[in-house]
Amino acid sequence: MRKGFLGMTAGTLAVGTILFLMPAPTVGQDTPPGPPREGGGRGGRGGGFGRGRSPLPPAGPFKRTADGKPDLSGYWNAANNGGAVFEVQKHPVARPGYPPGPGAIVDPPDGLIPYTPEYAKKAKANFDEHLADEPELHCYESGLPNQMYRQFGFQILQPAGYLVMNWEFMHAVRIIPTDNRPHGLPASTRLFEGDSVGRWEGETLVVDTTNLNDRTWLDSAGNVHSDQMHVVERFTPVDERTINYEATMDDPKAYTRPWTVKFPLSRNMQPNYEIMEFACIEGNQDVHHYIEETGGKAKAVIP
């Protein structure tokens, strides 16, 4: 019996064998480890889920960097995101492979992406072929905002003047200057994670991202965007274990108006948690076996 290549979504293969990045001691990581509050998500290596241990004490305030900014460094997971990894918009009715959920959209109030007619058709076509077409089958990075609600955890490092985000999934990395500099890439350069620059507005880190390509989906259901999408993210610390995350997407080619997602990020409290090596092999035969066993037909590699 063949093993499916996929975990929670098509194209997911985690190989937990080699430590990818050792955690460096920082001002925001000196709290003694304890059992997890939300669990560590998929992937990673830690000291177990702490079954039967006492609950954590109340969370304290965020620690500060040397320049007085909130220290966001540590390991994080998207928590209570309404099943956005399956489908970011409201999906109250289960579909094959997709459990129902409220999604993560808070604006518009109906919880749906305000598509133009052309891109609504693209999204429907993507869902109809998602087992064969999902970009992660080709080892693409997830892009924004999809990267933020993946089932795998990520690490934040905060050297002076920067925020670095390192995901286990696809080994995606974002290096974000936080000095409010202008965007530096020409319009013709389009990336999976785009060109991100940040600035502090009080306690909130605001990250502005342009220059995204159109080769990623917003979720595993095939919701889509164009190469004109502009994303503004807001990271607002609540306490030492919680960051409120919000992102607004504006795309005049794909959407009739901007729309916004919002959900909390929870600090990973597993003892000795580490991000692990991740392997994704485009064209792996298990992908074709999975597609065939679910009644689909494997397609050629997307150029």
At which residue positions do the language-model features occur?
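PEST-like low-complexity, intrinsically disordered acidic/proline/serine-rich tracts
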Residues: 2-303
